Amino acid sequence: MINVAIIGFGRMGRFYLAEFQKSDRYRVSYICDVDADCRQLAHKQAPEAKVVDDTEEIYKDASVDVVTLCALAGSRKEQIRRALEAGKHVIAEKPIADTIENEWEMVRLAEGCDRFTTVNMYLLNSWYHNEIRRFIDSGEIGELAIIRICHMTPGLAPGEGHETEGPCFHDCGMHYVNLARWYARSEYRTWHAQGMRMWSYKDPWWIQCHGTFQNGIVYDITQGFVYGQMSKDQTHNSYVDLIGTKGICHMTHNFKTAHVELRGVNETRIEERPFGGKNIDRLITEMADSIETGQRRKDMPTFRDSAVASEMAWKMLQDSYHTELPAIGDLQTLEAIRERRRNMTDGYGLLPRNNKNV
């Protein structure tokens, strides 16, 4: 079995543990967290693992094959460096470091060593996006011309969490920046962003960006955690439209079921399957396959994918500051939203109560 250590036992660390425990290919050897409450929970949920508050024992243990990095972004550069120096394979949350410069340094480090590295750009591992791309590749919609992506939820409120990853267009939006690039199979050429400072918060918490790729495909990406935080019954708006010269592909979901419409020149297919969540099961399967065969799985997201998406999300976010950036609402409403979320037990993107290392 592949021995794995989890560093950071907040929300994502717990997701990884659940998937590792379901797999017959992994053994969780260590869980590390600096927070005593997180370590206590780790003891309870993973009695088979050694729970520690320092990473050095993990790196010195030659039996550990893989480290999974789920602590805050500011710690990832040093943890990636230590892991690769110790000969470990690495699964990291995004972004892979706290600054663009540090991210590209980690890309160069990873690409210059013989260990397998990957990052949880989970949309690339979803059944629905892979099904859509196969349909596009078959020629059924003609040439792909327009990519439209929208993801708005009542998710993290400003100041609530993930501040080390920046405003939500970087923290969450970089997934969609990466997804558009993956569909286009091209690099970004132009971008223009319009933001909104909801509740008069200092940073835009909603952004729409549109532009072109180098191959001529156009895109628009809309992302924000602004979608009805105080609604009695909360909902969200998430979809992808791929528009070709002859047909279209459309996907939407309710976080439980994904609905896909494929409308080509010879075939119409409508499919519904379970959404799949963060798709961590597929990510760790790809890592296990790579380790056991000695050949990197081509579908496994790379550090370079993450760095490009992070850099472009920052550029788009910064572009929004150079246009008119209106502010609507007030900080009192924002504080009411935060208070509501502190007391919610069922909602969008709620953080664990002990959220220091989420």
Predicted feature locations:
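Hydrophobic residues in well-ordered beta-strands that form the structural core
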Residues: 53, 92, 117-119, 148, ...
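Contiguous beta-strand/loop segments that form the cofactor/metal-binding neighborhood of enzyme cores
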Residues: 177-259, 274, 282-295, 314-315, ...
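Beta-loop-alpha module in the N-terminal Rossmann-like domain of NAD(P)-dependent dehydrogenases
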Residues: 16, 46-109
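Mid-domain beta-loop-alpha active-site segment that forms a flexible
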Residues: 120-128, 151, 155-192, 199-206, ...
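Glycine- and charged-residue-rich phosphate/anionic-cofactor binding loop of Rossmann-like
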Residues: 27-29, 268-274, 290-308
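Active-site loop of classical SDR/Rossmann-like NAD(P)-dependent oxidoreductases
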Residues: 15, 34-37, 272-285, 301
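N-terminal Rossmann-like dinucleotide-binding module
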Residues: 1-46
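A contiguous active-site-proximal alpha/beta segment in oxidoreductase catalytic domains
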Residues: 74, 97-157
